[in-house]
Amino acid sequence: MIQPVFLLHRISRFGLRMGAAVAVTSTLLVAGVQAQTLRIGLAEDPDVLDPTMARSFVGRIVFSSLCDKLIDIDEKLNIVPQLATSWVWSPDNKILIMKLRAGVTFHDGEKFDAAAVKFNIERHKNLAGSNRRGELAPVVSVDALDELTVRLNMSEPFAPLLAVLADRAGMMVSPKAAQENPTNFGNKPVCSGPFRFTERVAQDRIVLERYANYWNKANIHFDKVIFQPVVDATVRLANLRSGQLDFIERVAPSDIPQLKSDTRFQVARITELGYQGITINTGKSDQAQKNPLGRDPRVREAFELSLDRAGIVQVAMDGEAVPGNQWLSPANSFYAKNTPVPKRNIARAKALLKEAGVVNPTFTLMTPTTSDGQRVAQVVQAMAKEAGFDVKIQSTEFATSLNLADKGQFDAYMLAWSGRADPDGNLFSFFGCKQPLNYSGYCKPEIDELLNKSRSTREPVERAKLFDQLAAKIDKDRPIVYLYHRNWLWAYNKKLTGVRPIPDGLMRVQGLQFK
């Protein structure tokens, strides 16, 4: 009963904002100036807008317009220049030298140079609470060789480094602004991207305005970008149809057929690099030992065997995902074929529960309030019940769920990870002891050893062997029960051109314009 009131409230507020926007646009047209605003609907409200501290997928969507990176990826996952124009490795693969783009400034007018890169990498590594520390662990020092040349020194070869620098660890913020506001930088971030931060209203909007001195300004065609979090996929779609949004991410799979039949809109689809899974508290806090799911791997195996992944994909995702049981899709060349997706087996699940001495185990599944998360949780709940599990669904606002996961205040957590171009980005931070995204609290020295070897090994065949070993060992403990790898589903006004679907699911604003 609460949800319909919420939906009407959101529509009403969007309608009021739309009316104001029309009035402003009319005024500008009279003055002979046509303002171009791009309005993007997000499935969640991002967490803190500081690349060092952030950890949400929707935050990365905002950062794509706000904070340039040293390098980026393209549609085929090739590493391409952004703030760095070229790079070269030393023969022993322990030094990376990067040449930087000249003439770049931050949004406060400060110069981007090698000293700024050194500051940012060190900030990522050393700032209290940094979520980038583990990503850059092998980088031991950074040297500014000259104004536009920077050297990253590593303790050992680090195969994922370029992929790491193509994401938040490679995002550059203004050293001056970060030093002036060390604790609340995320409330007013200063970067070097095509748009600068102007306003944020929690759960309502993030407003960015075009940065006049952007190095690639000829490729930017909007004066303003407004990100609006709209948790309910139905409302998100309604706002696209009414013209209050120009682009929406994570369209409900069930809405795709009707969108395809509407000539006003375009649909884009691409398989993600990440996964949807259920993270289980196996050691994050004392709460892990209070529930048989957390303390006994046999109960976790029984839970997994109660699930039909293909059924989940069909019922909850309308087929818009690939069933999976690892941090990578079965289509990925690094997928461990020695650990295939298990079939549902209710009889075996019940036998394991009996062996563990557990009758009708009960646990709470914390689930973000997103539409797809709720659908999947309900299907999981129904399937697990057939094996004797009593799953309680706890719907929690996304940023709040992350904070609770940090504290270990959960039994199981429905969490999607958007994925990275290198497998390490889906793996190390989730299973390395004391890593910031290790919400399960899983920690084993032999796993850490294999993780570190996979990072220092550059030969793909040898890395694949290490990933095979990791998959086999982690599968026995099941700190994460992987479910599937979804398709990113976008819908947007057909007048919007230049949209480039890339497997990381992020929207690049460069080249976007209304035709």
Question: What is the predicted function of each stretch?
Answer:
Residues 1-14:
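N-terminal secretory signal peptides that target proteins for export/translocation
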Residues 1-3, 99, 133-176:
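Surface-exposed binding/hinge segments that line
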Residues 20-28:
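Hydrophobic helical h-region of N-terminal Sec-dependent signal peptides
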Residues 30-35:
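Sec/Tat signal peptide C-region and signal peptidase I cleavage site
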Residues 41-91, 122, 190-191:
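N-terminal lobe/hinge region of extracytoplasmic solute-binding protein
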Residues 75, 101-131, 141-143, 189, ...:
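Extracytoplasmic/periplasmic ligand-capture domains
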Residues 483:
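Active-site-proximal polar cores
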Residues 490-515:
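Long beta-strand-rich cores associated with HINT superfamily self-processing modules
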